[in-house]
Amino acid sequence: MNPLQTSTWQNQAPSFWLLRFSFIWLVSQKCCTASAVWTAYMNISFHVGNRMLSELGETGVFGRSSILKRVAGVVVPPEGKIQNACDPNTTFILPRNKEPWIALIERGGCAFTQKIKVASEHGARGVIIYNFPGTGNQVFPMSHQAFEDIVVVMIGNIKGMEILHLIRKGVHVTVMVEVGRKHVIWLNHYFVSFMIVTTATLAYFTFYHIRRLWVARIENRRWKRLTRELKKAFGQLQVRVLKEGDEEVNPNADSCVICFEAYKPNEIVRILTCKHFFHKNCIDPWILAHGTCPMCKCDILKALGIQMDIEDGTDSLQVLMSNELPGTLSPVEEETNYELPPARTSSKVTHVQEHPTSSANAGSQPPEAEETSHPSHGQQVL
């Protein structure tokens, strides 16, 4: 037999969670690899009067398909008011001494690939694309087609406009782009969605199992308390062992209304609070299942001080009866512990007879036989 088919859910839980963790780890690794970006160090230099000013900072981000290498050149924007370089006929004012140059292009109007293609056809060594107006210095790794030997970098709108204003004032601006640091974006939108669903599922099942454990703990306490109460309550009910000569074992006497069998010597009977008695093995499960006397419908458990819903707890009470209550005692032990002396029975057991006997017969009957007469003699089941 395959042990995997016979193992319990608890034994399979560690393997299940290990498999789930491995799956999450693989997904996260894939997401992280796809979301790895490289920053760009940019050294921007320009002349102001007789002074040479430069600014160095990690202000750019390489495109996803850009080659990662160092590049330097003069910054050249498109000619005219439209700076997005989406038109294939876009022109650039190239340096006179044929210096390497890098195109400065505004984002928007077309795809990034189109902008890069226009600049590369004019001989640009690299392309710097600055973001939309109103985005500040926000940048992100651009998705574009790969171009051979072309460096593609995005910078913020503020930095791009500063460079553009300097160039429009006639300032000669050069830039050197170097590969910066590698950054891994752990939480892209796919991974975030997956984690949200997974976390919500785990939270639901965790809450569900905690609630089940809490309810089970309360039920366990309830049944333990009920067991103690039932032990105490059933200990209050009298138990008697029938003997030869008792009126109850007479062939003409009434039988047990539960099993419909006649009473026999050495059988154990339990006397209820209503003074009716039956076979102990018959009446105990009956009380636990119905809670009442099968003859007069007296609420036995209520009379013993136990308040509960019998219909909801029938099966559990019967289990408690078989496992916890003193019904497991042998007949000898029950006779020793619970048998009532004949002299005391007369003060506690009443006699219910629909057809009273004559005074002559009553006078000729021994007192002991009178006291041990069946309390339910001549009664019908209600």
From Swiss-Prot:
Q: What is its main location?
A: endoplasmic reticulum
A Gene Ontology CC term for this entry? endoplasmic reticulum membrane
Query: What is catalysed by this protein?
Result: S-ubiquitinyl-[E2 ubiquitin-conjugating enzyme]-L-cysteine + [acceptor protein]-L-lysine = [E2 ubiquitin-conjugating enzyme]-L-cysteine + N(6)-ubiquitinyl-[acceptor protein]-L-lysine
UniProt-annotated location(s): Endoplasmic reticulum membrane
Q: Which EC number applies? A: 2.3.2.27
Tell me what PTMs the record reports for this protein: Auto-ubiquitinated.
User: How is it placed in the membrane, per its record?
Assistant: Single-pass membrane protein
Region ranges (Disordered) = 328-382
Keywords annotated in UniProt: Endoplasmic reticulum, Membrane, Metal-binding, Transferase, Transmembrane, Transmembrane helix, Ubl conjugation, Ubl conjugation pathway, Zinc, Zinc-finger
Keyword check for Chaperone: no
Domain PA, chain residue ranges per copy: 65-167
Biased composition regions of type Polar residues, renumbered to the chain: 344-364
Q: Where are the zinc fingers (RING-type)?
A: 256-297
User: Which organs or tissues contain this protein?
Assistant: Expression is testis-specific.
Q: Which SMART domains does the record associate with it? A: RING
Q: Which Pfam families match?
A: PA (PF02225), zf-RING_2 (PF13639)
What is reported when this gene is inactivated? Answer: Male mutants display severe subfertility. Sperm cells show an aberrant head-neck morphology. Female mutants fertility is not affected.
What InterPro entries does the entry give? PA_dom_sf, PA_domain, Znf_RING, Znf_RING/FYVE/PHD
Q: What does this protein do?
A: Has E3 ubiquitin-protein ligase activity. Plays a role in male fecundity through the interaction with the E2 ubituitin-protein ligase UBE2J1.
Q: How does it assemble?
A: Interacts with E3 ligase UBE2J1.
The name under which this protein is listed is E3 ubiquitin-protein ligase RNF133
Recorded source organism is: Mus musculus
List the top taxonomic levels of the source.
Answer: Eukaryota, Metazoa, Chordata, Craniata, Vertebrata
